């Protein structure tokens, strides 16, 4: 067919005050149903299964000048991180067992190796910048969706399978993945 009409909706530009903090995945699962998604107007969770941790990113609209608390990217959040990550992922194609170590290393270099409030990074940015995420690699992904309330069990099942958790592990759940 031929597209004959397009409707485009937009909102005026706005500024976001955002912060991100590293937590254990068990903390994410515990707070998922209660207040995780209500902490701010914008909330994202980046789950890193091999490290069993996640980053909670939350932001709220403000009227302040974006220069009041500018984002200071780490040295790893640029060309160095991009090239190191690409080369490690390339190597992991031939030595797949290093993938958990690659995740641990890249996560630690980009976000920090510790968890908790002391890992919080905060900034004020225009929304067009704040809502972007630097994955350090070109993304070609297959996205999928499930109802939000099923998120914790899906992630826990994947974690049990990926990390080969034993039934004696307190975070173990039957994953039902046959291989």
List where the protein language model places each region.
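Noncatalytic alpha-helical scaffold of FAD-dependent oxidoreductases
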Residues: 1-179
């Amino acid at each position: 067919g031929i597209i004959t009409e397009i409707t485009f909706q937009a909102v005026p530009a706005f500024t976001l005050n955002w912060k991100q903090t590293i937590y254990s995945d068990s903390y994410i699962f515990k707070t998922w149903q209660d207040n995780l998604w209500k902490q701010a107007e914008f909330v994202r969770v980046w789950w890193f299964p091999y490290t069993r941790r996640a980053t909670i990113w939350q932001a709220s609209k403000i009227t302040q000048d974006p220069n009041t608390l500018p984002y200071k990217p780490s040295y790893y959040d640029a060309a160095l991180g991009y090239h190191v990550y690409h080369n490690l992922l390339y190597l992991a194609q031939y030595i797949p067992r290093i993938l958990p170590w690659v995740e641990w290393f890249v996560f630690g270099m980009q976000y920090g190796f510790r968890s908790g409030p002391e890992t919080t990074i905060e900034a004020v940015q225009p929304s067009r910048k704040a809502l972007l995420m630097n994955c350090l690699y070109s993304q070609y992904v297959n996205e999928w969706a499930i109802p939000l309330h099923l998120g914790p069990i899906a992630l826990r099942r994947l974690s049990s399978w990926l990390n080969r958790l034993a039934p004696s592990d307190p975070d173990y759940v039957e994953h039902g993945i046959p291989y």
